[in-house]
């Protein structure tokens, strides 16, 4: 859960009043993880500047530079030093990490109607790199790719299917020097519903200390039916996890199921879901709320 967060963002046109803009962001976040996995706190300061260029071809490009510094604090009353993964076992209860990443991203959405689509697809790709010594604790590269598709069919277009897939890979000179919040985690509204945000991923030893992963694979499949004008009932399943490709840590693929209501409102699609995780113990039914197109 996020306990405290503050962020300031400013945007202004650059070389075109509508299709080219600069955006700057600075912020602070305090996050406490206490989800039957570990008691852990992360204090993060971050800043970024990005140039967003919208092209007539539909491909939107983003050039970015972002910095984040994480201070990690472990509850010393819950863990002994010997029970913690490196580097926490060398730095007692506090550890500071940082990274400066230069990035490039492209994305494209094709649909019959951007506000109220009945068919379409989106695709997105990004790459961020950082160099050790240049305000980064290690050499690293983060690659992401994802896509979403929607198709409506049947009499009066009452039936609809939606699929989503998101993949990621993190290369680093030393994974333990990658800032904690820059690693891959899964769970939450836009990941695997039925689980808390970022509560899934590789864990360390018998203490189940959540360390994050260097790979990500998350997917979703949904079927919905229009039972009255502008209203649809949906059933769905989400699946995947953040993974450790070295084999040092174990974690299973997480699966959840759920149902929900979709309302095509004047301001866009409103989605209300309830979901429950099927993998792991003590999974409560969770409520998820969204406004906007699923593409």
Descriptions of predicted regions:
Residues 1-115, 119-124, 193-194, 198-205, ...:
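Gram-negative/organellar outer-membrane beta-barrel architecture
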Residues 233-236, 270-275:
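Conserved active-site loop/cleft motifs that coordinate metal ions or position small ligands
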């Amino acid at each position: 859960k996020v306990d405290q967060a503050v962020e300031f963002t400013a945007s202004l046109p650059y070389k075109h009043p509508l299709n080219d803009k600069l955006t700057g962001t600075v912020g602070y976040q305090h996050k406490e993880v206490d989800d039957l996995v570990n008691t852990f706190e992360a204090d993060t300061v971050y800043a970024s500047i990005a140039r967003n260029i919208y092209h007539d071809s539909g491909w939107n490009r983003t050039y970015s530079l972002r910095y984040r510094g994480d201070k990690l604090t472990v509850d010393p009353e819950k863990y002994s030093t010997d029970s913690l993964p490196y580097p926490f076992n060398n730095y007692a209860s506090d550890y500071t990490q940082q990274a400066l990443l230069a990035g490039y991203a492209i994305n494209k959405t094709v649909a019959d109607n951007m506000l109220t689509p009945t068919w379409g697809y989106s695709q997105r790709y990004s790459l961020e790199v950082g160099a050790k010594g240049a305000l980064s604790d290690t050499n690293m590269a983060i690659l992401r790719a994802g896509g979403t598709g929607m198709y409506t069919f049947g009499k009066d277009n009452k039936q609809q299917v939606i699929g989503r897939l998101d993949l990621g890979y993190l290369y680093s000179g030393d994974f333990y020097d990658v800032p904690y919040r820059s690693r891959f985690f899964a769970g939450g509204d836009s990941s695997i519903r039925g689980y808390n945000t970022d509560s899934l991923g590789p864990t360390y030893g018998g203490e189940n200390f959540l360390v994050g992963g260097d790979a990500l694979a998350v997917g979703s499949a949904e079927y919905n039916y229009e039972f009255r004008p502008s209203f649809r009932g949906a059933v769905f399943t989400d699946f995947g996890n953040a993974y450790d490709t070295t084999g040092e840590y174990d974690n299973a693929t997480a699966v959840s199921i759920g149902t929900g209501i979709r309302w095509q409102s004047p301001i866009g699609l409103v989605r209300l879901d309830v979901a429950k995780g099927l993998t792991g113990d003590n999974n409560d039914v969770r409520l998820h709320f969204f406004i906007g197109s699923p593409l």
